[in-house]
């Protein structure tokens, strides 16, 4: 039976069967970070969601058939402002934040994309596309800027499914007396006086830099061509970023449809509120790492809700994810687990528009199956299913011993355990009990075995 992936396509506003242009060459592009500040928990949701989609597509078509491109936006006004504020060079800032992004994503168990292009290394492709747009009367030069003519683009509002006036309500529009239409957006802008040369480049229209939207059109074209299969990003990118990408790419290449499937993940809030520095609820991935919260816990939290639905970060949600992983790891403890084929019901949940809440429930059901199993064979089968399914979605990459004892001083605990064993040999029951209670206060559980040895685990 042929495996079919169903994805909700924002472009058609329906769930569709994923039918790539070429099953031997699946093309996927995801908008990556703008490297001006450390990634926050909302940024990480997008990366984890598309990491899962990447894994699913690889499972169906094979790793050699999939090309996953995720860009680095290292040209942006926010980068200039941030570097100036910190008193460092632009390159120092972008290198530091890019490295932090990679560290954060490894912490969350994300696979690397096949290609991770930087905007600064593709200025020539951006210039090429802008020249095409000018030649086809979709862009114009004025006041040392190059603007895209929004009214020249067929079906400009197709992705957002709103009329032009509604789309721009509440959106900050760069005012210019020389723009043909207030909603026209910049493709190229001149450098400001005394501005860093690291963020500006020579072009046919003078020394300057590209607008944000042209960057992704250029990098997707460079590595995936005029047409590709999947374009992913956060719901906040539907307009204006993705809307403008479609417009300029289709106008530059009239025979192109650009991306066939548009996939968008929902917003993330913190304790029911929009995350912002002014509210004091801005949480970076580094903040979670510094609190010694396991990356697996954060990843499971991010997958606990359907990717298109809003997700709220709060202490209880993180605690629930930790308890769930504890339950799974406890279920496979002291069992000889083996990698097996993914069960049909689990795979079907992911093929149905990445229904991760159902996938998590299925793993929970198998964990319950371990504890109620009547035979060792049944326990082993259920435990093997747990580890196979969890590994597929990027979880349970530790042994139960490593999981339950992470963050503890094993040498110190072993020293106390040995000291207690010696006390028991000498029938010093008071000291033995004192050591047990001392470890218990640190949430370390001791278990005396019938052979005279003692094992320990974190509560």
From Swiss-Prot:
Motif 'KMSKS' region location, chain numbering: 274-278
Top-level taxon in the UniProt lineage: Bacteria
Enzyme Commission number(s): 6.1.1.16
Keywords noted in UniProt: Aminoacyl-tRNA synthetase, ATP-binding, Cytoplasm, Ligase, Metal-binding, Nucleotide-binding, Protein biosynthesis, Zinc
Cofactor(s), names only, from the UniProt record: Zn(2+)
Residues bound to ATP: 277
GO terms of biological process kind: cysteinyl-tRNA aminoacylation
InterPro entries reported for this sequence: Cys-tRNA-ligase, Cys-tRNA-synt_Ia_DALR, Cys-tRNA/MSH_ligase, Rossmann-like_a/b/a_fold, tRNA-synt_1_cat_dom, tRNAsynth_Ia_anticodon-bd
UniProt remark on cofactor binding: Binds 1 zinc ion per subunit.
CDD domains per record: CysRS_core (cd00672)
Localization per Swiss-Prot or TrEMBL: Cytoplasm
GO cellular component labels: cytosol
PANTHER family in the record: CYSTEINE--TRNA LIGASE, CYTOPLASMIC, CYSTEINYL-TRNA SYNTHETASE
Protein name, UniProt field: Cysteine--tRNA ligase
